[in-house]
């Protein structure tokens, strides 16, 4: 297929995600020196990591409202520039309080991205490529996760942890420049465009039953993602991988699995939809695979299994964890008109990311109490099974041939 304008949009927003996630994830392999410097337990370190998400979650709904009102591209670029400020503040922090505030600012800044980039992708992408477009463009999170963990770990072996964040400050500056130059803003065009749910109000978005169900189900993959995202290097350290760079390299499999997981599940969802099979089935299938594989991760850690096996299981778990989002976001883009899509995506992400406030701390607490991360993995598996049941409650009832009714049933309320 020749290069299309929407490919440019996908590519530049992927690069934006990479910069954001490298700054977000670099703290994971650097937690050990941070814990040593400030005398933190695993639970306290987990809370420090999760401080980012308090800002991130708090900004989701305002970000959608701001983008719908003032322009998605404008809000997107403002957020990216604030990410650079947050990274700089992290690198300059000399006390634990200042470090926590810097991470909170970084979370607030990155919270402006999601609710505005998803509608831009939806507006730029052909309808028959919607799940693939949402998946491919979302792969930047995985690539940024992998690079953040690997680069953070590698730099952490040769630089003080603060200087790592100073180096990473350049990424969002480049990203903001490229997006500002080459990505157009669909906000005004969206306000005039007819479509399903054209008369939907912001209040109707907040009353939307299936958005809340999808958000509650989405808490399960977010929980698993941030168990591995926070404690991935420590999982490998528990079974004997002591070198920071090596454990970070293995933990980066969480991000490496994102492009194939998102592309595979997005392609499957688009093809099944063309045959009349709804997207929620692919969402549930991905969650089930995630639940089974993260349980196997816990068992491998508990039994002190071989490193290669844990690496494979982390990759498989991550493949299914990321795979949830391509069909889920495509379904969202079909259910809501562009005019309120920012607030819809923001509300969905706010609900899902409540799990990120708890997963790092709870998993760290389980480690402190039991001496192992295995229990935290088992808890993630249980939540994954619950998520499957919740996802299947999205209307209409699952049956062959019903998929084409999904957007009409929900979007016109």
Task: For the regions a language model picked out, list residue spans one by one.
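Paired small-residue
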Residues: 86, 97-105, 308-316
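Structural signature of the two symmetry-related core transmembrane helices
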Residues: 74-88, 280-295
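Conserved MFS/SLC helix-loop-helix module at the cytosolic interface between two early adjacent transmembrane helices
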Residues: 58-94
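Extracytoplasmic gate region of multi-pass secondary transporters
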Residues: 27-28, 209-262, 325, 329
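Juxtamembrane intracellular "pre-TM" segments in multi-pass secondary transporters
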Residues: 1-3, 186-215
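Helix-breaking motifs and short loop linkers at transmembrane-helix boundaries and internal kinks
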Residues: 39, 71, 92-98, 300-301
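Cytoplasmic helix-loop-helix junction between adjacent transmembrane helices
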Residues: 102-141
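Helix-loop-helix hairpin linking two adjacent transmembrane segments in secondary transporters
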Residues: 137-181
């Amino acid at each position: 297929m020749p290069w299309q304008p929407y490919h440019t949009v996908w590519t530049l927003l992927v690069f934006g995600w990479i910069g954001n996630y490298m700054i977000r994830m670099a703290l994971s392999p650097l937690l050990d020196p941070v814990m040593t410097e400030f005398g933190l337990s695993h639970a306290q370190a987990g809370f420090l990591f999760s401080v980012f998400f308090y800002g991130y979650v708090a900004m989701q709904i305002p970000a959608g409202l701001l983008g719908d009102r003032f322009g998605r591209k404008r809000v997107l670029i403002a957020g990216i520039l604030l990410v650079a400020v947050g990274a700089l503040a992290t690198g300059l922090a000399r006390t634990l309080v200042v470090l926590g505030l810097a991470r909170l600012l970084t979370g607030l800044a990155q919270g402006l991205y999601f609710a505005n980039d998803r509608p831009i992708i939806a507006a730029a992408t052909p309808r028959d490529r919607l799940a693939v477009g949402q998946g491919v463009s979302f792969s930047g999170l995985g690539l940024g996760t992998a690079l953040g963990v690997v680069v953070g770990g590698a730099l952490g072996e040769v630089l003080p942890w603060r200087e790592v964040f100073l180096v990473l400050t350049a990424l969002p500056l480049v990203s903001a420049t490229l997006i500002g130059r080459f990505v157009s803003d669909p906000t005004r065009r969206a306000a005039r465009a007819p479509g399903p749910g054209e008369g939907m109000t912001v209040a109707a978005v907040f009353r939307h039953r299936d958005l809340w169900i999808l958000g509650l189900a989405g808490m399960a993959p977010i929980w698993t993602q941030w168990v591995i995202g926070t404690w991935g290097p420590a999982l490998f350290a528990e079974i004997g991988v002591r070198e920071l760079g090596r454990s970070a390299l293995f933990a980066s499999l969480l991000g490496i699995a994102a492009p194939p997981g998102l592309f595979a599940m997005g392609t499957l969802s688009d093809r099944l939809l063309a045959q009349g099979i709804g997207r929620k089935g692919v969402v549930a299938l991905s969650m089930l695979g995630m639940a089974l594989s993260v349980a196997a991760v816990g068992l491998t850690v508990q039994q002190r299994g071989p490193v290669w096996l844990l690496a494979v299981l982390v990759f498989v778990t991550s493949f299914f964890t990321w795979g949830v989002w391509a069909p889920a976001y495509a379904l969202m883009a079909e259910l809501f008109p562009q005019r309120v899509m920012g607030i819809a995506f923001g509300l969905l992400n706010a609900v899902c990311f409540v799990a990120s406030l708890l997963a790092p701390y709870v998993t760290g607490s389980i480690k402190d109490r039991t001496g192992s991360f295995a229990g935290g993995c088992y808890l993630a598996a249980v939540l994954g099974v619950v998520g499957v049941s919740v996802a299947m409650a999205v209307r209409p009832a699952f049956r062959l041939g019903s998929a084409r009714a999904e957007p009409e049933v929900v979007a016109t309320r």
